[in-house]
Design a protein with these regions (language model features):
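Hydrophobic, aromatic-enriched alpha-helical segments typical of multi-pass transmembrane helices
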Residues: 11-221
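Short, charged juxtamembrane terminal tails flanking transmembrane helices
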Residues: 2-8, 219-227
């Protein structure tokens, strides 16, 4: 009887770990999408000044690669947050898993495509923004990055009652402060046209880092009695 119960419980305990691994792989996939795709852009494209979104523009070389990576990263992040973190937090944190998951889907979406890269001759920021792809990307990425900037601060407070998660309160608080500062700097960089690509990449890296920390902790605490 005891052996049968243990056999039934084993898959349940593995479930959170599986979603934690998926969450980690999702961040790797998303990072690969922009870090690798940068290597084959033309000489006019610069990671310092051009955004990640331009890598998936209709005129970008091999745009299918970042599009596929971003889609995989977005879907993986959604599954990790909704099917991994939400059950692990057992109702103590209700909104944040959905905010994380939907942000992942928003950042993973590449359609409709941006019509051209700003580094290409004849492409302008106004032309990008007035297109369906450019406007969609601006709205979705802006909202998603904002959610990923403020969510760590909320989690830093809400996770304290959970013994297996309270140790992350301080790192999440730091990540939230840095991400919010990065979001403000990104808005300024986009307005002035100075180092927008660099600031965006730094902000995205911070967001991916704290998501990876959550994924590692989910794996580490899988099967723990207090989640």
């Amino acid at each position: 009887m005891t052996a049968n119960v243990a056999a039934r419980e084993r898959p349940r305990r593995r479930g959170p770990a599986v979603w934690g691994v998926i969450g980690l792989l999702a961040q790797v996939a998303f990072a690969a999408g922009w870090m690798i795709a940068e290597t084959w852009q033309g000489p006019r494209y610069s990671p310092l000044t051009d955004t990640i979104s331009d890598l998936q523009a209709a005129t970008a070389p091999h745009a299918w690669f970042p599009i596929a990576c971003f889609a995989a990263g977005g879907l993986g992040t959604f599954g990790f947050a909704v099917f991994g973190l939400r059950p692990a937090w057992r109702g103590a944190v209700r909104i944040a898993p959905w905010a994380i998951g939907l942000s992942g889907l928003a950042l993973g979406n590449s359609f409709p495509q941006i019509p051209c890269q700003l580094s290409a001759s004849g492409c302008t920021a106004t032309g990008q923004l007035l297109s369906a792809g450019g406007l969609t990307d601006a709205i979705l990425s802006g909202a998603a990055l904002w959610l990923l900037a403020i969510t760590p601060l909320q989690l830093a407070r809400l996770l304290i009652p959970l013994p297996q998660w309270r140790a992350l309160a301080r790192p999440l608080r730091v990540a939230g402060v840095v991400a919010l500062a990065g979001y403000g700097l990104l808005a300024l960089a986009l307005l002035t046209g100075v180092w927008a690509g660099l600031v965006e990449r730094a902000l995205v890296a911070v967001c991916q880092l704290w998501l990876a920390v959550l994924a590692v902790n989910l794996i580490r605490t899988s099967g723990a009695g207090d989640g």
